[in-house]
């Protein structure tokens, strides 16, 4: 897998990991997602990869790939976490990727608002800034953890799509936060 894969709590021999497959709503129905996934599959085959994998969920969730769309291209569920999040893979040789064992609990030790983040998504720096400002202004304890090494990525306590939020030890969401979402979701 490429460098993006190295920042995921996923193991797979020679797999290409799709971090994000998203098309803005205004472009829906124009075939862009189809073109992107077909290009990715062909690129992986040309590069001799074992397959392609991506994070999804049983029910559609924000910031995660649409499972129904991927199933149309032959992707299959190869691993699950908490009977909710799924690793989908399109294997070219029968080998299957899997989540790191550390992902299975989806819990941390700390009680404070804790965010694990990577910087592959262009929206993340702005979200971090908004969360820091809001928490500082309202005296809310905040723990920000940059996932900036291979070791941190492979030992994450949760599924990860470059943003993972915990509160009172529990995994809450991969939804990017801003002031409005903080107030609504956590009553902070």
Segments (PLM) and residue ranges:
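Short, small-residue-biased leader/transition segments that mark boundaries at the very start
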Residues: 2-5
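Conserved GNAT acetyl-CoA-binding A-motif
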Residues: 44-61
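Conserved acetyl-CoA binding element of GNAT-fold acetyltransferases
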Residues: 7-25
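Conserved catalytic-core motifs of GNAT/GCN5-like acyltransferases
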Residues: 55-56, 71-88, 172-175
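C-terminal "cap" of GNAT-fold acetyltransferases
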Residues: 82-104
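Local sequence-structure signature of Cys/Sec-based thiol-disulfide redox active-site neighborhoods
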Residues: 103-137
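Conserved acetyl-CoA-binding loop-helix of GNAT-fold acetyltransferases
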Residues: 23, 29-45
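Non-catalytic, surface beta->alpha helical segment in thiol-disulfide oxidoreductase systems
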Residues: 168-188
């Amino acid at each position: 897998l490429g460098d993006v894969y190295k920042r995921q709590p996923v193991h797979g021999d020679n797999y290409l990991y799709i971090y994000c497959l998203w098309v803005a709503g205004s472009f829906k129905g124009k075939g862009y997602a189809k073109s992107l996934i077909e290009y990715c599959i062909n690129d992986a085959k040309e590069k001799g990869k074992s397959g392609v994998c991506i994070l999804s969920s049983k029910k559609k969730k924000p910031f995660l790939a649409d499972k129904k769309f991927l199933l149309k291209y032959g992707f299959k569920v190869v691993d699950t976490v908490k009977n909710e999040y799924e690793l989908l893979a399109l294997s070219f040789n029968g080998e299957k990727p899997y989540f790191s064992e550390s992902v299975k609990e989806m819990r941390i030790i700390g009680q404070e608002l804790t965010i694990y983040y990577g910087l592959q998504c262009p929206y993340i720096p702005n979200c971090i800034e908004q969360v820091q400002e809001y928490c500082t202004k309202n005296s809310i304890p905040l723990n920000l953890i940059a996932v900036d090494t291979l070791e941190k990525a492979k030992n994450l306590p949760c599924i990860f799509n470059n943003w993972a939020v915990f509160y009172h030890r529990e995994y809450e969401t991969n939804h990017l936060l801003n002031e409005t979402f903080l107030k609504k979701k956590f009553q902070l």
